[in-house]
């Protein structure tokens, strides 16, 4: 471990003091950079030496099953000091890292390549048209109030009424989980609202927020027919988000990935592959 930390520290100093050349997309990084690249995602194929279905890590000497190894490519942009992993399991995903340290790059922890293309443009156009009409109505109301010399109290009441109508129209624009759920977007969070657990846990039965664990034994909060499991088995850290009519899982086992779903029901979102 001390040797590994020393290598990482030395390589970090090397990167900080010497601008490394661009590294075009390649299956295997240079051997002298393995200690750096293999720190963040240890299950990349170039970090392991496999014989007889048993793989030994080239840096830490750990051993794992060959089934845990995934194919990876690496890239470096020396101008912006960004280093990239491209990991392909069932669905490719990308990791951005600061080249100076093997950790996720701030603001770009993970992003997905979109398949199908352009399928959410009708939603964006619908929103733009709606807010354009709202803006015209708002300006028209201000002009109307000015010419009619309406009292400030009356003006504020009518503005409040207009705002309420706009708020109530959001479910029609965003197709939420149900007609009773009025929130437009669900920001990325690690725990969904309790009332939505059944929805989110239909697909992500392995997400940690679907389980209640005591003394190392976990019971599913939603599905009574799910057998008890050990706390360290099967459960993964998950976070969720809702964007327009699209719902997303951010699942982080050894290799993070995103799963897209229709917000109306927990089924795969058309046009996106999922793991």
Swiss-Prot record:
The lineage of its organism: Viruses, Varidnaviria, Bamfordvirae, Nucleocytoviricota, Pokkesviricetes. InterPro entries: ASFV_fam_110. Keywords: Glycoprotein, Host membrane, Membrane, Transmembrane, Transmembrane helix. The keyword Membrane applies. It comes from African swine fever virus (isolate Pig/Kenya/KEN-50/1950) (ASFV). This is Protein MGF 110-11L. Pfam families: v110. The chain crosses the membrane at residues 5-25, 127-147, 149-169. It is a multi-pass membrane protein. Its main location: host cell. It is found in: Host membrane. Glycans are attached at residue 61. GO terms for cellular component: host cell membrane; membrane. Plays a role in virus cell tropism, and may be required for efficient virus replication in macrophages. Belongs to the asfivirus MGF 110 family.
């Amino acid at each position: 471990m001390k040797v590994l930390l020393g290598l990482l520290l030395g390589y970090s100093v090397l990167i900080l003091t010497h601008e490394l050349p661009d590294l075009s997309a390649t299956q295997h990084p240079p051997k002298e950079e393995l200690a750096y690249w293999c720190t963040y995602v240890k299950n990349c194929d170039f970090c392991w030496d496999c014989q007889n279905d048993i793989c030994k890590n080239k840096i830490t000497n750990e051993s794992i099953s060959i089934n845990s190894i995934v194919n990876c490519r690496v890239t470096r942009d020396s101008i912006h000091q960004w280093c990239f992993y491209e990991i392909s399991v069932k669905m490719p995903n990308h990791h951005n890292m600061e080249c100076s340290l093997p950790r996720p790059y701030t603001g770009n922890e993970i992003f997905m390549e979109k398949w199908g293309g352009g399928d959410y443009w009708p939603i964006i156009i619908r929103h733009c048209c709606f807010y354009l009409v709202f803006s015209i109505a708002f300006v028209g109301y201000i002009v109307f109030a000015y010419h009619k010399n309406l009292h400030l109290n009356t003006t504020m009441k009518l503005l409040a009424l207009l705002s309420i109508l706009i708020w109530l129209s959001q479910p029609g624009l965003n197709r939420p989980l149900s007609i009773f759920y009025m929130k437009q977007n669900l920001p990325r969070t690690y725990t969904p609202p309790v009332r939505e657990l059944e929805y989110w846990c239909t697909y992500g039965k392995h997400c940690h927020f679907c389980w209640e664990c005591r003394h190392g034994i976990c019971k599913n909060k939603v599905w009574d027919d799910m057998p008890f499991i050990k706390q360290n088995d099967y459960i993964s850290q998950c976070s969720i988000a809702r964007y327009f009519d699209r719902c997303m899982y951010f699942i982080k086992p050894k290799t993070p990935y995103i799963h897209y779903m229709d917000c109306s029901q927990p089924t795969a979102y058309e046009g996106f592959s999922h793991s």
